């Protein structure tokens, strides 16, 4: 069996790694190739192009590197047309993958899109392309199935999120503190995750650091830890090394999973990390900033959606504070961090609500995906 997969960024690499591992167990001799990151490659995946080349965000970044991405997309389509897989799976990255899927499906290759494009937030017109591009949408958020059915009469299948299955309902924080060498830390631990993309970290890290500095100057005592999401971000961290050191922030060359599981509270960028932090039952403050042009265009295209952070979307209310664009200032971050440290009753409520959401999300994701994959291949 031959399986094609394209994942476009760190979160896609995480999803892809667990999927490739499950596929290898089910089909030991399967050839699985395409575009993926180091976690997928560690499971035996063959990446034809570096995944980092697709990890862009915002309209300015797309304009500056768009030709390179288009060239890779053209080559990957040509490759799979000449080396036809039994099925192709596009993981997230809809602006890249839907075109790949559409071209491959038109040539007779069965396709799956794993992680629904957020058409329930913006650019709903993409449903037309989705219909042409994919045999099945695999949704990782429970409400998406109902959205597709009721609004577009299109079948999406809820497969859960592997993080919901892999993260325990009850977190033994002492275990992860010990793993990170923090077992003797008695202060509250604040994890700081300013993003996984260069543009995110460049915009958010200085704001996060200044807010933490104000918090410390106000007398709050805590231990801050920050994972280095990938080596390519180290030059940005190095620019702020003196401030990071003066604030006593420990930069850990480890994955975000362990850092979040060892934490009591979190300050982080909007994105998949907020879902992970929610599953780790962490009260949090979320910040995010796009370039001015990206934000301007985004507001034109976005469809009246109230929330950016996954916990708020899933809870259908602002259970955690999200500070987006002009609201993402040092003063606002500082104020919300103070609330995070001070309001224990609110934090307890947040933790209990996160547990309820987590319980609802648990599904054997990889088994469900393989079940869908098998049914599609059998029909071909």
UniProtKB/Swiss-Prot annotation:
Q: Which family does it belong to?
A: Belongs to the LpxB family.
Question: Which pathway is recorded for this entry?
Answer: Bacterial outer membrane biogenesis; LPS lipid A biosynthesis
Q: Which organism is it from?
A: Francisella philomiragia subsp. philomiragia (strain ATCC 25017 / CCUG 19701 / FSC 153 / O#319-036)
InterPro entries given for it? Glyco_trans_19
Tell me the first and last residues of the signal peptide.
none
Q: Which GO terms describe its biological process?
A: lipid A biosynthetic process
Q: Which Pfam families match?
A: LpxB
CDD domains under this entry?
Glycosyltransferase_GTB-type
What does the protein in this record do?
Condensation of UDP-2,3-diacylglucosamine and 2,3-diacylglucosamine-1-phosphate to form lipid A disaccharide, a precursor of lipid A, a phosphorylated glycolipid that anchors the lipopolysaccharide to the outer membrane of the cell.
Identify the domain of life. Answer: Bacteria
**Enzyme Commission numbers on file:** 2.4.1.182
Q: Does the keyword Transferase apply?
A: yes
Instruction: Supply the alphabetized keyword list.
Output: Glycosyltransferase, Lipid A biosynthesis, Lipid biosynthesis, Lipid metabolism, Transferase
One of the record's GO cellular component terms: membrane
UniProt-recorded name of the protein: Lipid-A-disaccharide synthase
Q: In its keyword annotation, does this UniProt entry include Lipid biosynthesis?
A: yes
Coiled-coil positions are none
Which reaction does this chain catalyze? a lipid X + a UDP-2-N,3-O-bis[(3R)-3-hydroxyacyl]-alpha-D-glucosamine = a lipid A disaccharide + UDP + H(+)
Q: Which NCBIfam families match?
A: lpxB
**Gene Ontology terms, MF aspect:** lipid-A-disaccharide synthase activity; phospholipid binding
